[in-house]
C-alpha cells in the first residue's frame, strides 16, 4: 500500500491509515447471498487493489440494513457500521455508528431528486450537511433508468459508467467512479483538498452505500 504502513488487524492503525488517505478503492466480493467488499488504498494513478484495510459485510436477510466495516475478514469486532433507523426506512436515511454504537453521521438518499439522477447527502452527527453527491452525467442516468424499465435486451445499458460528483458548499471536491471491464463492481473514490476535516469513516460508508443501497 503506497505510503501507508499499518498492522493488518490493528484497529487504531487502520483508522489512522484511513484518515490520512484521500484515495480509496472499493472492490465488491462475489458472494451468493448478500454484499461483501474490500476497501484498500491503491497506488497513485492505479485502479488495482492495494492491501485491504477494511472488510465489509452486509448482513444477510436483515430486517434493518446492517453493514459492518472490520479490519479483518472474519466476523470479529467492527470499527464502524451502517444501520437503518427503522425497519422500513422509506426516507432513505441510514445512520453511521462507531464501534461503541455512537452516531457519527447519516447517509440520506434524496428520493425526489433521484427519480432522474441519483442524489445523496452525507451529514455529521449533528445533522449538518458535509457534502452531497449526484450522478456526473444526467444523460447516462436517464439511459440507465430507461434500461431498467424496458425489455431485457436493453439490460446492457445498466453497465454504462456509474460515476458521481462529490460537492461541498457548491464546489466539486471529489469523484466516485466505477472501473469498467471488471467482472465484479470496482470503484475508485478520490477526494480533493475540500474534504479536509471530514471523517473518512463517513466517506467510506457512503462509497459502499452507493453500491449496496443504491436501489433500496
Range-by-range predicted roles:
Residues 2-216:
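Intrinsically disordered, low-complexity proline/glycine-rich segments
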